[in-house]
Amino acid sequence: MAKLISRTEDGFYRLPAFVDAHVHVESSHLTPARFGRLIAAQGTLTAICDPHEIVNVMGEAGLAFMLEDAKRSPADLRFALPSCVPATPFETSGASLSVADTARLFAARPELIALGEMMNVPGVLSGDAEVLGKIAAAKAAGKPIDGHFPAGHGDPLVRYAAAGISSDHESLTADEALEKVAAGMTVFIREGSAAKNLAAILPAVTDGNWERFCFCTDDISAEDLLASGGIVNCIRMAVALGMDPERAVALATVNPARHYGLPVSDLDFVVVRDLVGFEIIRVVKDGRPLDASGPSPDSAAVANTVRLPDLSRHDFRAPGPKDGKLDVIGVTDGSLVTDHLRRDPSDTGDLALLSVVERHGKNGNIASAWTARTGLRRGALATTVAHDHHNLLALGNDPGDIRTAAAHLASLGGGQCVVLNGEVIADLPLPIAGLMSPCPAADVTAKANALKSAARQTGCSLADPFATLSFLALPVIPALKLTDRGLV
């Protein structure tokens, strides 16, 4: 392979522009245009985006918004067509996409680059007609199929990959990553906000298999992007952990481009100060210095998506013991994986109430359960970002504060907030589908940081409370989660 890193006349280092192999723009709470401006300034000029967050809320209207708004991004945002809308049968989403919809959209929108991550692993393995139909539609359109198989091992993994699924970003260990490579998959090494797996997986990359690895951020906040960067941070970390810079750059450039059949243009490149800190000196797109300016997005088409039932404090209570024990979601800070704990009813010292309220106006479902290890002792946190159905999710100690938080988010059209003693002490409005803000990254970050500080007043000890909270309703990642239909 030709060398990817060269010296510039002014003594710096020139690298190909970076590619994020898998990201959900909505997790940044930024619109595609604003997200693209931010990552482009950090050298990422291409990102493979799976919009299954907004499509689970708004369906095809949400997809259309993302594609249109992305046209104002200086980065090339390529969108996959979500495969799991809804993500599972165990939740209420705002929309659904059928096999016929999938085939029609691939035909109508040739710019769609892949079938988004196939989270319905049981459906693949059992030969579910809907799942296999979507895979067949992607194959007929000549599109790669992105995967999602946490803790994938053995014969189930081999069968999952053999169905035509060519990538996975859910590996937690080097051994898991190696098994996925052996099954024929490309492994995307994830370093995001809620899930940070790069250090654990990097030892799997060898002289014989490095072409089968890429970097991705998956779900990353605007504040993390501003603080340390996205893909440039992956390169920086990999080199600090001992990877050769040339190889680290390959995982961020030519490898994801090859996987998705994208060109690597000599006219798109990044100049960095050195091969340690990878400080960005300049970014060049189409042979010209990057222009990251642009108009503010129009978000009216995807506003007003929070439709809650009438609520009282009495709606928020957890079920009692079953067979003498409480079922409890054991939260692990910095991980998307939870534990299924069985607690004695007298052992409630560290428990907090988790509640999900259906917010799409479909059925008004409300479900609650106990969580452990969050540290929360008073007040409530609430969010309309709850993967992947994005119903309203609240964590609290006081049902009255939970009700206040839910009502406040409904008044904002979605977002995140902290309530203490009946008062909203911090919020982040997300009026675009209850997921995104029309504001610039710096404004979103300031609000998000204020939320984190406010969350500390509840006793919450999680490093990124709202990022962790948003995954407590995602049943496709084990072991115990809560949706509007109950514990899964």
Regions found by a protein language model. Name each.
Residues 7-8, 40-42, 226-242, 246-488:
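Active-site microenvironment of metallo-dependent hydrolases
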Residues 96-116, 123-188, 195-215, 226-240, ...:
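Histidine/acidic residue-rich metal-binding segments in metalloenzymes
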Residues 58-62, 88-94, 126-130, 156-160, ...:
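Short acidic, glycine/serine/threonine-rich loops at helix termini
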Residues 19-32, 86-100, 163-166, 170:
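Active-site mouth loops of central-metabolism enzymes
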Residues 22, 43, 66, 115, ...:
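Divalent metal-coordination and catalytic microenvironments
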Residues 24-30, 52-54, 82-87, 118-122, ...:
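Active-site beta-loop-alpha junctions enriched in small/polar residues
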Residues 33-142, 425-429:
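Divalent-metal coordination cores built from histidine and acidic residues
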